[in-house]
Amino acid sequence: MRRNQLPIPVFLLLLLLLPRDATAATGKPRYVVLVPSELYAGVPEKVCVHLNHLNETVTLNVTLEYGVQYSNLLIDQAVDKDSSYCSSFTISRPLSPSALIAVEIKGPTHHFIKKKSMWITKAESPVFVQTDKPIYKPGQTVKFRVVSVDISFRPVNETFPVVYIENPKRNRIFQWQNVDLPGGLHQLSFPLSVEPALGIYKVVVQKDSGKKIEHSFEVKEYVLPKFEVQVKMPKTMAFLEEELVVTACGLYTYGKPVPGLVTMKVCRKYTQSYSNCHGQHSKSICEEFSKQADEKGCFRQVVKTKVFQPRQKGYDMKIEVEAKIKEDGTGIELTGTGSCEIANTLSKLKFTKANTFYRPGLPFFGQVLLVDEKGQPIPNKNLTVQVNSVRSQFTFTTDEHGLANILIDTTNFTFSFMGIRVIYKQNNICFDNWWVDEYHTQADHSAARIFSPSRSYIQLELVLGTLACGQTQEIRIHFLLNEDALKDAKDLTFYYLIKARGSIFNSGSHVLPLEQGKVKGVVSFPIRVEPGMAPVAKLIVYTILPNEELIADVQKFDIEKCFANTVNLSFPSAQSLPASDTHLTVKATPLSLCALTAVDQSVLLLKPEAKLSPQSIYNLLPQKAEQGAYLGPLPYKGGENCIKAEDITHNGIVYTPKQDLNDNDAYSVFQSIGLKIFTNTRVHKPRYCPMYQAYPPLPYVGEPQALAMSAIPGAGYRSSNIRTSSMMMMGASEVAQEVEVRETVRKYFPETWIWDMVPLDLSGDGELPVKVPDTITEWKASAFCLSGTTGLGLSSTISHKVFQPFFLELTLPYSVVRGEAFILKATVLNYMPHCIRIHVSLEMSPDFLAVPVGSHEDSHCICGNERKTVSWAVTPKSLGEVNFTATAEALQSPELCGNKVAEVPALVQKDTVVKPVIVEPEGIEKEQTYNTLLCPQDAELQENWTLDLPANVVEGSARATQSVLGDILGSAMQNLQNLLQMPYGCGEQNMVLFVPNIYVLEYLNETQQLTEAIKSKAISYLISGYQRQLNYQHSDGSYSTFGDRGMRHSQGNTWLTAFVLKAFAQAQSYIYIEKTHITNAFNWLSMKQRENGCFQQSGSLLNNAMKGGVDDEVTLSAYITIALLEMPLPVTHSVVRNALFCLETAWASISNSQESHVYTKALLAYAFALAGNRAKRSEVLESLNKDAVNEEESVHWQRPKNVEENVREMRSFSYKPRAPSAEVEMTAYVLLAYLTSASSRPTRDLSSSDLTTASKIVKWISKQQNSHGGFSSTQDTVVALQALSKYGAATFTKSNKEVSVTIESSGTVSGTLHVNNGNRLLLQEVRLADLPGNYITKVSGSGCVYLQTSLKYNILPEAEGEAPFTLKVNTLPLNFDKAEHHRKFQIHINVSYIGERPNSNMVIVDVKMVSGFIPVKPSVKKLQDQSNIQRTEVNTNHVLIYIEKLTNQTMGFSFAVEQDIPVKNLKPAPVKVYDYYETDEFAIEEYSAPFSSDSEQGNA
């Protein structure tokens, strides 16, 4: 038989028949103990106790239990009849994330004990990272701060296991371990390489718990904008509006308007959801407008919206605007954008505040806000309020702020759940595929009824808005009391408790005298709003009625996000002059430590960022669970008796009682804000005894998501509620006329001006004196301070404008060729309200000839907000860097400017700007280097030498120096980042910037010459090189010359991967290298090993010398084996053991061969030496000695004769002979083989014969060095420097003796230099004046010195000899309009290889710009779309194009250049193509601008 529920009238009758003693007052003692439902470990927490009607002394014990272990939180003895207090406790180290909290109250006749489950969470300290700016250029230094505070914002002396930098490819490129934060703050810095991976980087801070705090910054190649383009328009417009006002304004960073042409494009884009043509330009609706900016730098346009069809679907529901402003004078064009949403929702309603619960008989409070589509309040409109659909309906009117306060009388409400809907306008539901209809949103809210057996209630009146820190807020309580429940009580005490940041913050009470018959009314009391209550405070108010019933209500307050440490930051004035002195004053809590920052507004225009703000700091706070969660498996032991739900049979029908579960009770109120309540008062609604379950039903706590969580029975797992985020910080008296003229000379232009720490004194004051930068801009400055007492405080961002009433700007080319002329423009800008008379002058110099352009006037009138440009036609006469100094001076003159009197500025009367121009000689630069190693032993040595110049040398271009060093690696040490005058744009070339630093550090360390300065510089180069090399890494751990290039097919290169693997393994001793990079590279290489132990080639060999005259596999395997042994891996390692088997097998074949195989044998000799195989090492060296070239007491090795002769012929077209790269490399490998033995310190166990041979090899190698200490190319430089460093360590001796070097020419002493232990690493240089000339160098004393003579000169290109490349260069105007054709043209290049080999190695095409022109970067970048072009670079006035290889098939490509500065008498510019590894193989061709033969002879 189906069971039926008992009818409601019968159920109510049963409730009335409940025993009277269930509701009667007993007068027994009452206990209330309150604890947060989640506790933090390591920070103070509170437990609050309320004891009432005690008739005996009791002991209170609050205990935290972990199984059989426990800790006491509170032990107290209560004597007073009534007491209410809170007590603090701290949980040091929790044994488990969950525990039981037990409350026991025991007296002679009373015993109360209850246990509840509890979460315990370690309080994670909020941590944030602040960088000095949001965006960086390659090569700049990233500065950042790590800050740690507790949940009260007091500094935490925390230690982080690791802080690291992660690049856009998620590679860890640098790290700091065990970073301490004394005082809660630590500053770190990190240098970016000159060629880093561009994109988003991260600073990652890892805590002990493993949690990571990440902060992002961008690395980008950029130029700071001079001005910004602002597009001002409504964010939203109604679809019925007919006009849209759009304003575009240009403002300089110093706040002044930009004069220029404004172009505005207004579009609504096409966006059918089923179309692939979203945003398709041809289907977009667009209009364009153009006009000169007004005096405010703005252009205002009223746009008619009808053309954009705002009511039609199928288009984006927004109008987008792109505005461009082209600055007058310079032609610089910048863009700004804006958009306006087209809204069909014409009104929106939302609840700003409302009661969470409702209590029958007490008014329900709520507030709603009505706004239009733009978010503007709609005043004086009637709103309809419906309760539970249309059962009850009310009308309220909005005030002038669009707010309507809702007050609903609930006296007659009987429903357990109240749903409230607020309506402004009803919607007409109409679905149309083509047209948009208007819509009005409604506001909805729900409130559950609170159960009270006596129908007694209290309700807090809503507090609207955000409460300010420091204010006193009145709390109003509405009450409705049952007289029977009050009995004869004369007063009633209201207890309140404030919960903030998950913990109990404060508590108190207020007594209400009871008047006879007054059971309904309002009582109020004040509370003070304090910073510790922010951002949200939860107030719970409760009282205990004489019938033992507890009634309560709760309300949340939004608190101003304030800090106890108030920080004020100020400059003495809002504006300063460039280069003046000022100071930044900071005020905060005494003895605070303050971190100050000031960033150029231009940086923030380029990369806006979120400021470090109260909101961002408060977002870092961990969040506790707000709802009490049942953890299980604690059996349910409610303090209240349950009602047995027995069936009732009536007229033969069985009725089941209906239990109402929808009402909330006082227990739910406490639970809703995360409080555990232990009490013997009545806080629960009646419950039926459980029939089938061992555990209680989880209470509904008023939040749908909490109810959903509680539906999981026995849930013992809970994800972390602690949220950690990271933040970036923005980063920001008159002089009388007779006094000396004040002049500014501007040359200091930083992007971050201030990045300093300032400790405050006992009065809370601090001052930072600073020099104002020369940038005419606005600086954004801010500060945060840390105090051990009041914690963290933030200042507001302040602005400081650097400005002067008038200033001068110079427009110059980067470089010109001697004989060319250019127009130097000096523009004076006047931003004063009055006119000034200005004299503009250019300081004359013998280095150039300057002639004024146009009518020459001694002075010029410039009125307010106007500018004047004065020009000179300049012809440089000297070579090198020529400085141009221009001055604008305000004159005291009776002469009127029109009808206005010219005034003299009080602060600055003169502005001077100095800018350089590089003046280059005509033709192509050549360099010859002569190196000599002289070792006098207490006797004078003399060397005669001659500097000759070729017949076709360019007059005045020759310059020469002789350098003297006391150390074999001295020159290389001076030029570690400039060993080669070649580009470094690929994965192998970058290693020449990386690896030599390791050898220098090892050499200096072994010879005890390592200083902190050298170590710091070398390590910084290693860090930079490590960053760059990761650009060439593939996802599988391998490396290739140009890296993983996205869609273009590329694979790892076996040879380069081995090179990188060895270098990274060796660099670990000096810098952080991520282990996975070494592991992954080694694993990848291991996969390339064949069964015979040899390695197979993957990727192309850009250097043909690696082929070595034998099977490529043997040479490559020898190279990889050397790399593995140098890591070092032991010879017993399986990969190494198998590789050595490959080499031994190969040597057996080579030793019986009649061919030379010099390159391969050199590698084999060194590999066997590293492996400790002395026998094989001796065999190979003996074979190599037969191939050795002995000359002039030196020894070296060279390639087979036929190749050598071909190369020598090629040299006849080039420089004075220097050994090819491959010969230096193979000779260096032989030197390494001689210097390496099996001992732990191999260089100390060498025989005298080995050292003698090594010395002869060193003499030859040292003669091949270039003027920077490198050699011809990358591999020869790396291997030769490694060999020289080993030789230097083997032969190093300290001596107190000195060597003197005297240089004479024609009987005249050019210079005398002295070398000793104190300066042996110092590069000493003498400039040689006689060119051509005969010189004598005399060396005396005891020791060795390295002499290097460098001769540089320019020659005019001649068709001499047969070049191994064909090169043709043509130019063509891009615009045939005669007035414009000289401003832009195309350079087309055809190139091929016609040398002796089937194809070239990697080739560089170097295109120098003609003066006054710059490359169009997108057209250069587009060249990389061609399969054979691997990379392009734009270097000042050069374009570099990397080509993988060339054959005899002609390859053609082109790119565009455009005019930057007008230059007359344009000279041709050279294009050079050369083999990167055989630098003697090259060709040169000149090109001219297509209009250079015009009558004007230039582009001026």
Swiss-Prot record:
Widely expressed. Highest level in ovary, testis, uterus and prostate. Protein found in plasma. Disulfide bonds join C48-C86, C249-C298, C267-C286, C469-C562, C594-C785, C642-C689, C835-C863, C861-C897, C935-C1344, C1094-C1142. The keyword Signal applies. The keyword Metal-binding does not apply. Keywords: Bait region, Disulfide bond, Glycoprotein, Protease inhibitor, Secreted, Serine protease inhibitor, Signal, Thioester bond. One of its GO terms (cellular component) is extracellular space. Residues 1-24 form the signal peptide. It is found in: Secreted. It holds the Pfam family TED_complement. Gene3D superfamilies: 1.50.10.20, 2.20.130.20, 2.60.120.1540, 2.60.40.1930, 2.60.40.1940, 6.20.50.160, Alpha-macroglobulin, receptor-binding domain (2.60.40.690), Immunoglobulins (2.60.40.10). GO terms for molecular function: brain-derived neurotrophic factor binding; endopeptidase inhibitor activity; nerve growth factor binding; protease binding; protein-containing complex binding; serine-type endopeptidase inhibitor activity. Glycans are attached at N55, N61, N157, N382, N412, N568, N883, N944, N1005, N1390, N1448. Residues 686-746 are annotated as: Bait region. InterPro entries: A-macroglobulin_rcpt-bd, A-macroglobulin_rcpt-bd_sf, A2M/Complement_sys, A2M_N_BRD, A2M_TED, Alpha-macroglob_thiol-ester_cl, Alpha-macroglobulin_TED, Ig-like_fold. Residues 1360-1500 are annotated as: Receptor-binding domain. SMART domains: A2M, A2M_N_2, A2M_recep, Thiol-ester_cl. Its main location: secreted. There is a cross-link at C986-Q989 (Isoglutamyl cysteine thioester (Cys-Gln)). Belongs to the protease inhibitor I39 (alpha-2-macroglobulin) family. Is able to inhibit all four classes of proteinases by a unique 'trapping' mechanism. This protein has a peptide stretch, called the 'bait region' which contains specific cleavage sites for different proteinases. When a proteinase cleaves the bait region, a conformational change is induced in the protein which traps the proteinase. The entrapped enzyme remains active against low molecular weight substrates (activity against high molecular weight substrates is greatly reduced). Homotetramer; disulfide-linked. This is Alpha-1-macroglobulin. It comes from Rattus norvegicus. The gene is A1m.
